[in-house]
Structures are given as structure tokens and as C-alpha cells.
């Protein structure tokens, strides 16, 4: 069952930079660090299938596609509904209502922090938000970073975020410094 889910996730996310298979894999392995006891089958399916569709609203599209995939691999209807709910609530503004959904939610946010986060958000700033300059990218990354910690739900998530946010603040301060060059005189 896991093999089929993994292969499907690889096939659906191949060639993507910010929301590709590597992201899903990091989210799964990060999520496992956030709680000691959880339903691994549920967490596995939700994390590997949460970004399989990019069309917005991607959480809705991914949840619908996940339902078909999980039905095909033999998940029970009740577990399919839980996976869908986790996927639907994984976005930063989401309000997950059970442990595995909170784990996915927080791990997804954590993957947008630190150096990986800076890289993912820079890609996203251009492709999803239409940033036209490095200054625009910097603004979007700072905005996300500033909101991220308050959206984390689990104690271990907040602890993991601290080091990542500290790194981001140093790196973004350096980027801001490098971008703050005066325009050359035309004289």
C-alpha cells in the first residue's frame, strides 16, 4: 500500500522545485518528529499526497485526487475521509482538528523555514506570487517568516522553528544588506 502511494506521489510531483516529491518526503520525516504516537498509515498518505495537484485551491484538488488514489489502494472510507481532512487543513491558515492533521500542517510550515524554506519561498515568490525583483522576494519571505511561528500548533514544531527562524533572520538581513546598494549616478 505504501509503495503505491509513494510511487503515485513521485509520478505526480516529478520535476517540481518547491512542491515536489522532495518536499513531500521532508514533510513526512519532519512530521514524524512532532509526536510520539500517531497513525503512521494516515500520516504517510496525507503527507505524500498533500501537494499532488498544484492548481488552486491546491488543498481541495489534492484532497479530491487523494480520495481516488486511496480508494484504489484499499484504504477504508473512514480513513480516506481523515486523509482528506488532513490535506484540506494543511495550509498555514488551516485549522486541523486531529493529531495527524496537525502534524502535517506544522511539518508543511516547517519546510518553508530555514534554508530550505528560503529557497522554496523564493521559487514560490516568482511562480505563485509574481514577484518581479529580489526585493519583492525578500518582502514575501519576511512576511511568511513573521507569520509562521504563530501558526504552528504543536510544542515540538515551535521548538524546531526557533533555530530555522533565527537562521532565516540572519540570512535575510544579509540579503537586505546586499540589496541596499544605491543606484548609480548617470552623471
Which residue ranges define each predicted feature?
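Extreme N-terminal tail/first-helix region
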Residues: 1-15
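An amphipathic alpha-helix signature
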Residues: 2, 6, 28, 63-67, ...
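Onset of an N-terminal alpha helix
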Residues: 2-6, 21-24, 42
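Divalent metal-dependent phosphate-bond-processing catalytic cores, especially two-metal-ion Mg2+/Mn2+ enzymes
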Residues: 11-38, 49, 94-187
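Short glycine/serine- and small hydrophobic-enriched flexible loop segments
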Residues: 32-33, 67-71
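His-Asp-centered metal-binding catalytic motifs of divalent-metal-dependent phosphohydrolases/nucleases
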Residues: 40-58, 62, 66, 82-92
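Basic, amphipathic juxtamembrane/active-site segments
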Residues: 65, 69, 123-124
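Short helix-capping segments at alpha-helix termini
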Residues: 72-79
